[in-house]
From Swiss-Prot:
Gene transcribed to yield this protein: CYCD1-1
GO MF entries: cyclin-dependent protein serine/threonine kinase regulator activity
The keyword Cell division is annotated on this UniProt entry: yes
Name this polypeptide is given: Cyclin-D1-1
InterPro entries, alphabetized: Cyclin, Cyclin-like_dom, Cyclin-like_sf, Cyclin_C-dom, Cyclin_N
Organism for this UniProt entry: Oryza sativa subsp. japonica (Rice)
A Pfam family it matches: Cyclin_N
Residue stretches of biased makeup (Acidic residues): 66-75
Length: 363
């Protein structure tokens, strides 16, 4: 597969136009997700409305464009310059040459079927998630964008270890959030703008693009994950007495989910169980909103969707309680750090949510 790099943005914040010169069918099939590849293989006919060039990932094209600038570098290497910003406003530049794709030793690579996630295995996880939520709040991303970024980061770190440097985890955060924004948002911000003010390390766009490609390869190009937000509205309608109260429940459930993704164990649960537990938690927080129902339990919630079980919902519900209690304690100690967790909706719906807050008892 060959690419031709046409041009770059003046700031270097986005990759230039990449033209596909020669694409072989086998190469395209390898780049597609499993569901897309299945469509191509069905009766030997290509998927409707798709072409080889349109099936290529934007991140892959961007990374390929960046590769043209450094032909002598390793295919999966991350090389460049990192800028560290100190609290005093001074900037320190460091050159680095680190190959993320080649672990130092076999013991650094976890097996494909890794054990359940725990905070012990992920130092700095909470700080990384907080940064993603802060960027989501600044740019007005959808809640699903932040969740996908955290999910990509979790899947990557489940099979690949990073060096013990702050810039490595920060680079992974930026790359995962950039990929998630390209998947969920109608318009993803430039890579330089994605690194908001206050970010400790600032990376060149081409460095982020290389890391995006490494993440894509590690995730086997499967980015279309199911998120809990796909179930929230449906589950909220199951218990809401009206469209308005259902919307209020859905908003609160989304906020609960975003607050809970700091807990690694929460990601062990399937998306539907997360959504059911979050809606159940929102109902129990404001029972006045459910005047037409005497109570909603894990047992009744298990009937909302095929695959839900009372045990899974109860387990997820307990994690939500622990996560929200921990978040409340941290907010009391550091109110500014966790401010990003309080906003759930995008900027277009914030004014509407303010009108709905405090009126759970009205239908």
């Amino acid at each position: 597969m060959m690419y031709k790099h046409v041009g770059d943005d003046a700031r270097g914040s986005s990759a230039g136009v990449v033209c596909c010169v020669d694409v072989v069918d086998d190469d395209v099939d390898a780049l597609l997700c499993g569901e897309d590849a299945g469509e191509l293989e069905r009766e030997g006919e290509p998927a409707q409305g798709s072409s080889p060039s349109s099936s290529l990932s934007c991140a892959a094209a961007a990374a390929a464009a960046a590769d043209d600038d450094d032909e002598d570098e390793d295919e999966h290497g991350v090389h460049g310059e990192v800028v560290q910003v100190t609290p005093g406003g001074e900037e320190h530049c460091y050159d680095y040459d680190y190959d993320v794709d080649v672990p130092v030793g076999a013991e650094l690579v976890m097996p494909a079927c890794s054990p359940p996630r725990t905070a012990v295995h992920r130092p700095g996880w909470s700080e990384s998630v907080s940064w993603i939520l802060k960027v989501r709040s600044v740019h007005g991303f959808q809640p699903a964008t932040a969740y996908l970024a955290v999910s990509y980061m979790d899947r990557f770190m489940s099979s690949r270890s990073l060096p013990d440097h702050g810039w490595a985890s920060q680079l992974l955060c930026v790359a995962c959030l950039s990929l998630a924004a390209k998947m969920e948002e109608s318009s993803a911000p430039p890579l330089l703008d994605l690194q908001i003010e206050g970010t400790r390390f600032i990376f060149e766009p081409r460095t982020i693009q290389r890391m995006e490609l490494i993440v894509l390869v590690e995730l086997d190009w499967r980015l279309r994950s199911v998120t809990p937000f796909a179930f929230v509205d449906f589950f909220a309608c199951k218990v809401g007495s009206s469209g308005r109260s259902s919307r209020i429940l859905a908003l609160r459930a989304c906020q609960i989910i975003l607050s809970a993704i700091h807990e690694l164990e929460f990601l062990n649960h399937c998306a539907s169980s997360m959504a059911a537990a979050a809606v159940l938690f929102a109902v129990n927080e404001s029972p006045a909103a459910m005047s037409h129902r005497s109570s909603v339990s894990s047992e009744s919630a298990a009937s909302w969707c095929i695959g839900l079980t009372e045990e899974r919902i109860s387990s997820c519900y307990q994690l939500l309680q622990r996560a929200l209690n921990a978040t409340a304690r941290k907010r009391k100690r550091h109110p500014m750090i966790l401010a990003a967790c309080s906003s759930v909706t995008s900027s277009s719906s914030r004014s509407k949510r303010r009108k709905l807050d405090g009126h759970f008892g009205e239908d």
